[in-house]
């Protein structure tokens, strides 16, 4: 089957004045006269205006099937920039719903979105889940050992003076890391290793990093209360016991935060000022080869991406699932 798949995204901030009309004319001309005749047009939504309108008109003129691939709702994205009460959002919603109903077929990325389309839009959609690239897969023990040996020099040095995962092992030790040690040919997990939590961020104001810091402090306080520890107890004694191999009922947490962005230094300073005993943070930038290995080596993934509709599945979570990593995220109506 010969398909033409249209996935071009237009900037929502540009939907003013005559721009959508100009885009509509150019897109319609392109689809009608420049594209060799396919069997169907598949258009990714959003954007909805003018894309859905242009593709629907082109499919009608060329007598081709018109299929919409729903990844989110365009009117909810527009509402983030102009406000949900704006009349432009209502108009956009009408166009999106009306032309979505004209499709010969619909695909969507979650069952929650499928239910929303069926109940409130009158659209029957087939769920086609997003899939991660093949290199997002579980990490073998040997790959984990090599990865953490490479990262050892970063993991052993805290953002502050010292923390609960500051290790005595050498940064160049190729047989031992915070999590594993090698004895002869056997790779063994350390019994008192920290639990590894991974989150990626662009360090921008639209990503709420504060919530992760608050959760870390809450965990630290909760564990101290459950173990009936005195708040004034010297953390140095605790860390010395941990370095000596002592095991506790509740694990230490090591958060590795990956990514680059404008607010990185701001939050690194906040991390340095955290008064926690069982939680540590490391910030780093990983290569495209190392990031999937880290996901496959972690115990938990955290995604702080917020969705305008709450119905689409973030690709960060898809990547984590591909690596076999359980994930927690912010207020999604996940129904798989």
Across the structure, where does each feature detected by a protein language model lie?
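Conserved donor-binding/catalytic core segment of Leloir-type glycosyltransferases
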Residues: 157-171, 179-180, 186-207, 212-218, ...
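Nucleotide-sugar-dependent
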Residues: 207, 285-321, 326-336
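Nucleotide-activated donor-binding/catalytic signature segment of Leloir-type glycosyltransferases, i.e.
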Residues: 234-259, 264-293
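An aromatic- and histidine-rich active-site surface loop
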Residues: 24, 38-63, 68-76
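A short, charged, and often flexible helix/loop element on the N-terminal side
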Residues: 13-29, 81-88
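Membrane-proximal helix-turn-helix segments that form the acceptor-binding/catalytic region
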Residues: 50-53, 57-61, 68, 86-106, ...
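Helix-loop-beta element that forms the nucleotide-linked donor phosphate-binding surface
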Residues: 101-102, 107-108, 113-170
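A conserved mid-protein helix/loop that constitutes part of the nucleotide-sugar donor-binding site
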Residues: 202-244, 262-265
């Amino acid at each position: 089957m010969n398909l033409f798949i249209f996935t071009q995204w237009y900037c929502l901030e540009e939907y003013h004045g005559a721009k959508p009309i100009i885009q509509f004319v150019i897109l319609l001309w392109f689809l009608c006269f420049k594209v060799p005749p396919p069997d169907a047009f598949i258009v990714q939504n959003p954007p909805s205006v003018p894309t859905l309108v242009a593709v629907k008109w082109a499919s009608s003129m060329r007598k081709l099937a018109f299929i919409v691939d729903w990844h989110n709702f365009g009117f909810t994205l527009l509402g983030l920039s102009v406000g949900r009460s704006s009349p432009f959002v209502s108009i956009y919603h009408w166009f999106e719903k009306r032309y979505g109903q004209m499709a010969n077929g619909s695909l969507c990325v979650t069952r929650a979105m499928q239910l929303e389309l069926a109940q409130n839009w009158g659209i029957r959609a087939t769920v086609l889940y997003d899939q991660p690239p093949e290199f997002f897969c579980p990490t073998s023990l040997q790959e984990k050992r090599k990865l953490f040996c490479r990262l050892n020099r970063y993991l052993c040095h805290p953002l502050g003076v010292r923390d609960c995962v500051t290790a005595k092992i050498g940064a160049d030790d190729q047989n031992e890391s915070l999590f594993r040690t090698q004895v002869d040919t056997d790779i063994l997990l350390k019994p008192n290793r920290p639990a590894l939590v991974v989150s990626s961020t662009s360090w921008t104001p639209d990503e709420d990093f504060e919530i992760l810091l608050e959760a870390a402090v809450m965990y630290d306080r909760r564990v101290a209360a459950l173990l009936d520890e005195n708040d004034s107890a010297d953390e140095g004694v605790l860390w010395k016991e941990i370095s000596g191999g002592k095991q506790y009922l509740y694990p230490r947490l090591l958060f590795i935060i990956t990514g680059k962005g404008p607010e990185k230094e701001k939050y690194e300073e906040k991390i340095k000022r955290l008064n926690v005993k069982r939680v540590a943070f490391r910030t780093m930038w990983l290569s495209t080869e190392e990031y999937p290995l880290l996901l496959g080596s972690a115990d938990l993934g955290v995604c702080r991406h917020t969705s305008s509709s709450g119905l689409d599945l973030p690709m960060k979570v898809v990547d984590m699932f591909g690596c076999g990593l359980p994930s927690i995220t912010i207020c999604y109506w996940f129904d798989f």
